[in-house]
Each structure stands twice: as C-alpha cells, then as structure tokens.
Regions:
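Juxtamembrane transmembrane-helix boundary signature
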Residues: 54-76
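Hydrophobic/aromatic residues within the transmembrane alpha-helices of Major Facilitator Superfamily
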Residues: 21-28, 57-60, 64, 159, ...
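Helix-loop-helix hairpins and the membrane-proximal interhelical loops
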Residues: 1-47, 173-175, 209-307, 451-453, ...
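Helix-loop-helix junctions within the multi-pass membrane cores of secondary transporters/permeases
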Residues: 1-34, 54, 75-150, 290-391
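Residue-level signature of catalytic and energy-coupling elements of molecular machines
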Residues: 17, 37, 134, 203, ...
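Membrane-embedded alpha-helical modules
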Residues: 90, 104-214, 349-463
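Loop-to-helix transition at the N-terminal end of transmembrane alpha-helices
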Residues: 42-60
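Membrane-interface helix caps of multi-pass small-molecule transporters
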Residues: 36, 60, 64, 85, ...
Length: 463
C-alpha cells in the first residue's frame, strides 16, 4: 500500500478502510435522494445506476490520482436546479404555445448536455488554473451567502417533499396537515438525525433515512399510511431486495440534445453559466474545507496537487452527464471519513467500492419515499445555512447586502441561478454607488455584465 503513502501520512490500511466506509455511510443518502429529485423528469432506475457508477468512478479517480480522502457524487442543490428550476421551470417557456401545458419534451436531455459541456469547460479551466483565479475574485461574503441560500433552497424542497410546506392559494405557501403521516414521519426523521448527529454517530443522515423509512413501512402495515398511486402516494415496501437492474441506464445514458442547444444558444449558455458558478463555489469550498480538516494544506494555506483534485471533479461532471445524472461534485461529507482518520486516497477508493456494491440493492434505494429523504434535505440544508454566520453583518452593509440577496432570493424565487444573479449584481451596484468601485474585481465585472445581458434579453424578449 506504499502507492498511497500511508506511513508518510501517519495512517494504516484498517484506518483508511474504516474512514472510507464512514464517508459512504455519511453520503449514501444521495443514492435515495438523487433518483427521487431527478426522477421527476427522468427514469428513476437509470438515475440511480448513473449516480452509483459516476460516484464510484469519480471517487476512484480522486483516490488513485490525487491521493486525497475526498469522495464525489451528484451535488445536492445542483440536482434540484437541474430538475425543478431548468427542466420544469425555465425550459417550459420554449414549448409549443398551442399546448395548454407547454414544455420542452427533451428538457432533461438539454440539461444533461449543459452539464456535459460544463464539465468540458471545467477541464479547460483546470488546465489553465482559471478556476482558482475565479474563486479568488469573488467576495467572501457573497460566497457565504450563496452557500447559505442553497441550504435554504434544499431544505425548502425537503419540506415540500414531506408535505410540511404545501401550496396555498391565499398565502402562496402554507403548513401541511398533521393528519398526514408523511408530515409526521418526516418531522420524526429530522429529530432522529439531529439526535444521532449530537451524539457524533457516523452516518447519522443515512440512519435517519432508514429509520424513518422503517417507521413508514410499519405505518403502511398497520393501515395509517394509505397507498394511493392515483394521488402520488406509493407503497414504501420494496417488492425485492437484490437486483442488478441496469435496464434504466439505457433511458438516461448518452441522451444529449445538441440540436435544441445550438438552436437556442443564448438560453443554453445561460444554463451552462448557472451550472458553472454553482458547481464552482461548491467544489472549491468543499475541497479546501476537507483538506484543512485533514491537515493537507501547506504552510501557505494552499492545497498541494490542487490540479488533479479540480480536474477529477470536472471529469466526474462530464462522466455523470454521459451516464445520466446531474453535476458530480466533491462532498462535504468526506469530512466524516477524515474525522475517522482518513488521510489518503485509500479512503476514497474504499468509498468508491461501496458505491459499486450499492448497485445490487437498487430496489431498496428506489423504494425509499420522499418523506424519508426529506429529513436529510432539511438537515443538510441546516449545515449549509451555517455559512451565513460567517458573513460580517456588523461591518459595512455594502459588503453584506450582496450575500444577503443571494441567500434570501434562492428559496423565494425557487431558483439558485436567480439568487446568484441578484447577489452578484447587488454587490457590484452597491459598491459603485457607495464610492467603492475599486473593490469590484475583473471577475465580478465580467459576471455582472453577463447577468445584465441576461436581464436585458428577458425584458426585450430577445432570447
């Protein structure tokens, strides 16, 4: 095992395997949540297989090439943007006007095409080390606001999935009924996860999902949870446990739509830019955070071999799109494995092996109901929202307003891209009108004019 330089990193095989297993337990919920979210617009089984394969291969590359204990999978928030904001939302305006419910039939294919191109662009940016420069050009308060906003957005989606928050014609949204078993079970699930996390139980999120699901099975058996497929209430009891079913993969793999993308290039570019920036913040922040916790940063606070790390993330994104899943990114849950002593790529390789093994249990993961995965979304959202505490509210409001707008607009507009646009544009405008235009970096000016052009196109109905 000298390949991983275990002695140099003061670790051993046993520790690395335990760490890799812990990381998997901490992030395995994505195998239930990603098919649940993307399954609203794609083949659910295909998404599951694509997620497991892309996660395994990307994590293997990270471990074998970069030799870092960082695992990758489909990013939360990015998958929600993929399914709800773009597929169901933004692309609807380009459907057939004669259709009472206009939409683009191949919306998810267009999104996969955008994710694939995003990965290629990231590869190019990684080669020329542009990604690091882009991140350094974005204000810290804005980064924190974006992360926190994604957290609120993810939590909101979770609450919708559990019927905690429902549509209301008078107030737009309202509180669901406590007579609904899904709502009650989801709240119990949140409590379970928090209690486990409080006691530092590794895999608290996964255990929370499984226990909530188990309670749902009991609820169905005793007749409290009523199955009603016509109203979207399905059985939570799987018909089998083991199955190497790859049939759904043919419904998702290599399903690109370059025709529409080229015919509507301005809109396609706008989608790519949104994916680019959201993925950029998530990846770099996660990588630095995990590296710092694992004491992998050098004396200058920089990450050695940052190139292979960021390139792996880019390769994973394009690979995931080819297989049929949303943006692949580094997972902050990798810190769970680091906390168990993981220091090398052997930790990542172990996690990758677990993702491959998970392929045999697809019926189990696909039977997990939304009310069982909702607690995970709500809890992970809380972890992300903590970034707002890093914003300097007591200092100059000109430094904080942009981050605040990003933070608040994401859930209210139900769009990550809109939140980023409001945040970045607000930051630049406030700086200019408070006489601090010199604080605006070249990167921020470029982004400002990109979003300004996008707004102009919407107003003039040019795109």
């Amino acid at each position: 095992m000298d390949f991983f330089k275990l002695k140099e990193h003061d670790t051993n095989v046993r520790t690395e395997i335990i760490a890799g297993t812990t990381t998997f337990l901490a992030m395995a919920y994505i195998l239930a949540i990603n098919p649940s979210i993307l399954g609203t617009v794609m083949n659910e089984n295909g998404v599951f297989v694509a997620t497991a394969l892309a996660s395994a291969i990307s994590t293997f590359i990270m471990g074998l090439w970069a030799n870092y204990p960082i695992a990758l999978s489909a990013g939360l928030g990015l998958n929600a943007y993929f399914a709800f904001t773009v597929c169901i939302g933004e692309l609807n305006q380009f459907g057939d006007p004669a259709n009472p419910n206009p939409s683009v039939p191949n919306a998810w294919m267009i999104c996969l095409t955008a994710v694939f191109v995003e990965g290629i662009i990231f590869m190019i940016l990684s080669i020329f080390k542009v990604r690091e420069k882009l991140v350094n050009g974005i204000p810290v308060n804005l980064k924190h606001g974006i992360t926190a906003g994604i957290g609120l957005f993810v939590a909101f989606i979770g609450m919708q999935g559990a019927n905690i928050i429902i549509a209301d014609s008078s107030t737009i949204v309202g509180l669901g009924s406590f007579k609904d078993p899904a709502l009650v079970l989801a709240i119990v699930g949140v409590i379970i996860i928090v209690v486990f996390a409080h006691h530092h139980v590794k895999g608290a999120v996964l255990y929370g999902i499984l226990i909530t699901w188990g309670l749902g099975i009991i609820a169905e058996k005793i007749g409290w949870y009523h199955v009603d497929p016509a109203n979207g209430v399905f059985s939570v009891i799987p018909d089998k446990v083991l199955s190497l079913d790859f049939s759904g993969l043919k419904e998702t793999a290599f399903h690109f739509d370059f025709g529409w993308s080229l015919a509507h290039l301005p809109q396609f570019i706008a989608i790519i830019v949104s994916f680019l920036y959201v993925d950029l913040f998530d990846t770099v922040g996660t990588v630095v955070g995990v590296a710092e916790k694992a004491n992998l940063l050098d004396e200058n606070g920089e990450l050695p071999k940052a190139g292979p790390v960021l390139m792996t993330d880019a390769i994973g994104t394009s690979l995931g799109a080819c297989l049929g899943t949303s943006t692949i990114t580094s997972f902050v849950e990798s810190t769970a494995g680091v906390a168990e002593g993981g220091r090398t790529g052997l930790t990542a390789v172990t996690t990758g092996c677990w993702f491959l093994l998970a392929l045999a249990f697809s019926p189990l993961f696909l039977a997990i109901p939304s009310f069982a995965t909702a607690p995970a979304l709500i809890y992970v959202g809380m972890l992300m929202v903590q970034s707002v505490t890093k914003m300097s509210f007591e200092d100059d409001p000109a430094d904080t307003m942009g981050g605040y707008m990003a933070f608040i607009m994401m859930p209210l507009s139900y769009s990550i891209a809109t939140g980023i646009m409001f945040g970045m544009m607000t930051w630049v405008i406030v700086k200019v009108f408070t006489g601090k235009a010199k604080d605006v970096s070249v990167v921020m000016w470029v982004v400002f004019f990109i979003f300004l052009a996008r707004i102009a196109s919407i107003v003039t109905n040019f795109f």
